[in-house]
């Protein structure tokens, strides 16, 4: 992908702005990776920001060299409040260091087609925009450009990651006629049974390694946002 190559060659740091599915999946992949591999060590450092905590946020954006920093802004709807706050907070800082006509070389936007606030802002500064597939929900977007662009920039192999995901799906679907042989189906049935029959609605995922902490947070968001609605289901 030309944009990933550009970010790898030009920048020392890359700031990923997003929340929920727009950032948790790529953060999990990045933090689970072997940071000692040559490809990752030679790639830019990713800063995947999921909120605007004043202390962490201000300290980060004030220390970055924006002539050597790329920014990717991700919002499926193009109007996600947290993501727009992130972008509108960092944009004035960048403009203190760069001319407006320089922004297009260091900022890329990912959002779905159509008229939305993020696309309007991108058009104002002539920023490149990649389409977020409208058919893919934000929380499931890690294997799309949303997750794979940061993955490529970080030095990971996006093709291998997607092939690995396909292998897991193939294994699950191979036992579709015998659900008892599919661990995912058994786990789902147990979870539903506990919730419906015993009112046990809390799902716990323990990460026994720091590298898996972001995986647990991503899982929590995927699970609760998908299955815990209107006081029903599990969280």
How should each PLM-predicted stretch be described?
Residues 13-17, 70, 108, 204:
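Conserved beta-strand elements of the Class I
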Residues 10, 39-43, 66-67, 99-104, ...:
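Short helix-terminating capping/connector loops at secondary-structure junctions
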Residues 25-30, 58-61, 82-87, 117-124, ...:
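Short acidic, glycine/serine/threonine-rich loops at helix termini
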Residues 1, 27-70, 74, 79, ...:
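Glycine-rich oxoanion-binding loops at beta->alpha junctions
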Residues 96-235:
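Active-site phosphate/pyrophosphate-binding segments
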Residues 15, 19-26, 76-84, 113-116, ...:
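Gly/Ser/Thr-rich loops at beta-strand to alpha-helix junctions
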